[in-house]
């Protein structure tokens, strides 16, 4: 968790919204209980990844049945504070890929997402950390 906090603190936001999201995520990570599980009804961590072909001319997306739309791959931390492990597991589960190389270990983007229109809604927000 200390590594994640360090990454969050050193992350340079892309815009004002991401700056606000970053501060909220840092505050919640420092103070909230169960921030890596769905037990936290206010918010919890999720991860996503942009999967890019080796020659960087294609991306892999997955169809989300609940939202009826295409999206990048990802999922919930489900108690694991090592978000890199979480995204590797999600990539394998959702695509079958096991030989994945990160272009960077740095945070690609941060978002606080509301959970709207989801039939399994049991939380208000998700903290999303994206890898590339």
Where on the chain are the PLM-derived regions?
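Generic structural "secondary-structure junction" signal
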Residues: 38, 47, 72-74, 79, ...
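Generic N-terminal amphipathic, Lys/Arg-enriched alpha-helix
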Residues: 2-12
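Acidic, metal-coordinating catalytic segment for phosphate/diphosphate chemistry
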Residues: 10-48
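A glycine-rich, hydrophobic loop/mini-helix early in the fold
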Residues: 34-69
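Conserved Nudix-box catalytic region and its N-terminal flanking loop in Nudix hydrolases
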Residues: 55-100
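A structural signal for well-ordered alpha-helical scaffolds and beta->alpha junctions
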Residues: 1, 18, 22, 84, ...
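Active-site segment of metal-dependent pyrophosphate-handling enzymes
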Residues: 96-132
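Histidine-centered active-site/metal-ligand motif
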Residues: 44, 64, 76, 93, ...
């Amino acid at each position: 968790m200390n590594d994640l906090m360090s990454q969050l603190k050193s992350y340079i936001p892309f815009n004002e919204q991401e700056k606000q999201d970053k501060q909220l995520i840092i505050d919640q990570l420092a103070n909230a209980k169960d921030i890596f599980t769905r037990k936290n009804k206010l918010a919890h961590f999720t991860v996503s990844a942009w999967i890019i072909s080796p020659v960087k001319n294609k991306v892999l997306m997955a169809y989300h049945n609940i939202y009826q739309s295409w999206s990048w791959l990802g999922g919930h931390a489900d108690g694991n504070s090592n978000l890199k492990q979480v995204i590797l597991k999600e990539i394998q589960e959702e695509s079958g890929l096991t030989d994945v190389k990160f272009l960077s270990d740095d945070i690609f983007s941060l978002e606080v997402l509301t959970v709207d229109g989801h039939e399994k809604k049991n939380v208000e927000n998700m903290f999303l950390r994206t890898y590339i």
